[in-house]
């Protein structure tokens, strides 16, 4: 535990999350003062990104020209936006920087390469700039020590989910459907199974990319409620091809990101599919909405297959932006309640937890764990060689 005057005087932690969907900044104001109790969400705040900022972020998901300059100019620019959002939250709650123990800053992932030689991960949104502009200590760079210990550096949220389900008598899954989808498996208390978690594949990423490409003048950058997808028909042969992807079929521990599942990846898949079906004199893609319907089925199947590979029954709690895609939730629910499986499906709201802010709460907890000297990774999840306290501190 650190010995710092700021820690002694403050009461709350702020968790900051900017996800791979690149839609905005999520903030969670969290109280951990009741030892042994679940963390209490005091307030939340959301600030959407402008189209210009979102484009700057997504353009860095793939290698390109002048990317070092672009990345580190954006590193500072995002920190400035983060600080504005923090100040807006403080004003909303009539708090001052002295009321905050620390900010747990995930930042914005622009590249995540956990495999191969010299694996690395890069999150921008400069912690030092954020600390200086807000006058609040920042804990960030949470993924790097886990990777230094041979882990994937992701996912990090399962250990926080474990804190929320301490009294579970049934197997529970937390399914976060962001740009990338990930699951946490929380076995029953009397089970000898370990908590597991991994990225299953694309969540909203490909759905958003394909929608935006074909609706450039839409006010939305996503397929609201999956409405467009529902006008199309799933293409079974294309779905089968997508499900054969190497990442989908790789074993955990594993993690991925937008540098893998992106529009260019999809275009390559479609080109290969059209060539294969053309050689068989088949025409199976009639409308772009058919591809959207197939992508929705791909997300639902990759998630459901991962869940059913671990157990045949349990409770599934959904969170993340994908929860608001009605068609996607229905497709996932249909798969999990078919055949011989017995799953009860809810959103995190059933537990009185705002699923939209859950990841931000997790990074508030990671900052708290840093201050308490608690282990905050799960080697069974990330593949790290040891448990450790994650993060680094940046003083104002």
Swiss-Prot record:
Keywords: ATP-binding, Carbohydrate metabolism, Kinase, Nucleotide-binding, Transferase. Its EC number is 2.7.1.170. GO terms for biological process: 1,6-anhydro-N-acetyl-beta-muramic acid catabolic process; amino sugar metabolic process; peptidoglycan turnover. Pathway: Amino-sugar metabolism; 1,6-anhydro-N-acetylmuramate degradation; Cell wall biogenesis; peptidoglycan recycling. InterPro entries: Anhydro_N_Ac-Mur_kinase (IPR005338), ATPase_NBD (IPR043129). The keyword Transferase applies. ATP binds at residues 19-26. It catalyses: 1,6-anhydro-N-acetyl-beta-muramate + ATP + H2O = N-acetyl-D-muramate 6-phosphate + ADP + H(+). One of its GO terms (molecular function) is phosphotransferase activity, alcohol group as acceptor. Pfam families: AnmK. CDD domains: ASKHA_NBD_ANMK. Belongs to the anhydro-N-acetylmuramic acid kinase family. Catalyzes the specific phosphorylation of 1,6-anhydro-N-acetylmuramic acid (anhMurNAc) with the simultaneous cleavage of the 1,6-anhydro ring, generating MurNAc-6-P. Is required for the utilization of anhMurNAc either imported from the medium or derived from its own cell wall murein, and thus plays a role in cell wall recycling. This is Anhydro-N-acetylmuramic acid kinase. It comes from Colwellia psychrerythraea (strain 34H / ATCC BAA-681).
């Amino acid at each position: 535990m650190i010995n710092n005057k700021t820690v002694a005087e403050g009461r709350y932690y702020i968790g900051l999350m900017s996800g791979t969907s690149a839609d905005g900044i999520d903030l969670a104001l969290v109280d951990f003062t009741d030892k042994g109790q679940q963390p209490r969400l005091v307030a939340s705040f959301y600030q959407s990104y402008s189209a210009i900022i979102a484009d700057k972020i997504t353009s860095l998901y793939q290698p390109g020209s002048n990317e070092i300059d672009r990345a580190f100019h954006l590193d500072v620019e995002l920190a400035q936006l983060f600080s504005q959002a923090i100040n807006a939250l403080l004003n909303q709650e009539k708090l001052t920087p002295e009321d905050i123990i620390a900010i747990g800053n995930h930042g914005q992932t622009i590249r995540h390469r956990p495999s191969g030689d010299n694996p690395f991960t890069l999150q921008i949104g400069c912690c030092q700039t954020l600390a200086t502009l807000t006058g609040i200590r920042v804990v960030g760079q949470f993924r790097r020590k886990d990777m230094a210990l041979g882990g994937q550096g992701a996912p990090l949220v399962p250990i926080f989910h474990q804190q929320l389900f301490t009294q579970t008598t049934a197997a529970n899954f937390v399914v976060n459907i962001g740009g990338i989808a990930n699951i946490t498996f929380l076995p029953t208390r009397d089970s000898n199974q370990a908590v597991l978690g991994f990225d299953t594949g694309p969540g909203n990423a490909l759905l958003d990319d394909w929608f935006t490409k074909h609706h450039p003048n839409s006010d939305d950058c996503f397929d609201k409620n999956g409405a467009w997808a529902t006008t199309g028909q799933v293409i079974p042969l294309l779905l089968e091809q997508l499900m054969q992807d190497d990442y989908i079929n790789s074993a955990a521990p594993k993690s991925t990101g937008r540098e893998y599942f992106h529009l260019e990846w999809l275009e390559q898949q479609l080109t290969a599919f059209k060539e294969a079906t053309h050689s068989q004199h088949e025409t199976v893609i009639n409308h772009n909405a058919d591809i959207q319907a197939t992508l929705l089925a791909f997300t639902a199947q990759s998630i459901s297959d991962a869940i059913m590979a671990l157990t045949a029954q349990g409770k599934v709690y959904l969170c993340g932006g994908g929860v608001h895609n009605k068609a996607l939730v229905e497709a996932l629910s249909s798969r999990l309640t078919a055949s011989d499986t017995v799953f009860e499906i809810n959103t995190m709201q059933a537990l009185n937890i705002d699923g939209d802010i859950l990841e931000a709460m997790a990074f508030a907890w990671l900052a708290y764990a840093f201050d308490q000297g608690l282990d905050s990774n799960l080697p069974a999840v990330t593949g790290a060689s040891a448990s450790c306290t994650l993060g680094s501190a940046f003083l104002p």
